From Swiss-Prot:
Name of the featured protein: Small ribosomal subunit protein uS4
GO biological process: ribosomal small subunit biogenesis; translation
Family: Belongs to the universal ribosomal protein uS4 family.
Species: Levilactobacillus brevis (strain ATCC 367 / BCRC 12310 / CIP 105137 / JCM 1170 / LMG 11437 / NCIMB 947 / NCTC 947) (Lactobacillus brevis)
Region span, Disordered: 21-43
Assigned keywords, A-Z: Ribonucleoprotein, Ribosomal protein, RNA-binding, rRNA-binding
Length: 201
């Protein structure tokens, strides 16, 4: 299954979650797309509820189903912690997500493009793989020739706050993961146990 590249607002409204992180998609029309979206009151089955939760997380991180499931299987091999929490930590450690968390991009989709186009380095080496798994202490920074990009400057200036598990130097446009996040620091509205149930059904 390929990665969805269409309008994110349609998926946001269908799943009831802001994929952009701004919430703008849901402010004006907090219901599913379509002429009768506002009047729908669809009752989901147990499977439907699990599927929707899985899709929320997958689309939030902008991954294909294969990428998502492979990472889920990897999380299941980690001995400490719960499967769901370990899965979410692995998702957070993706390079494109860390670029977003550091505030170098306003959305994960924008962050993924910055990585794909070679604007990001890890420990001084250019890395153009969005799924690259960031380790604690590795320095993520903007390439020297890319530091004047308006899209990056605008993103940094727009940041309101950053997660406590990252540190960032605005002058150097560089930051790092200082520790693994706790489950309560991640999406509190998402029930990761439903995703575990979905794949283990």
């Amino acid at each position: 299954m390929s990665r969805y590249t269409g309008p994110s607002w349609r998926i946001s409204r269908r799943l009831g979650v802001s994929l952009s992180g701004t919430g703008k998609e849901l402010n004006r029309r907090p219901y599913a797309p379509g002429d009768h979206g506002q009047g729908r009151r669809q009752k989901l089955s147990e499977y439907g509820t699990q599927l929707r939760e899985k899709q929320k997380l997958r689309f939030t991180y902008g991954m294909t189903e294969r990428q998502f499931y492979n990472l889920f299987k990897r999380a299941g091999k980690i001995k400490e912690g719960t499967h769901g929490t370990n899965f979410m930590i692995l998702l957070e450690r993706r390079l494109d997500n860390m670029v977003y968390r550091l505030g170098l991009a306003t959305t994960r989709r924008q962050a993924r493009q910055l990585v794909n186009h070679g604007h990001i380095t890890v420990d001084g080496q250019r890395v153009d793989i969005p799924s690259y798994e960031v380790k604690i202490g590795q320095v993520i920074s903007v390439r020297e020739k890319s530091k004047d990009m308006a899209i990056i400057k605008g993103a940094v200036e727009a940041v309101v706050g950053r997660p406590q598990y990252v540190e960032f130097d605005a002058d150097k446009l560089a930051g790092s993961l200082t520790r693994f996040p706790q489950r309560e620091e991640l999406d509190a509205e998402l029930d990761d146990s439903l995703i575990v149930e979905y794949y283990n059904r």
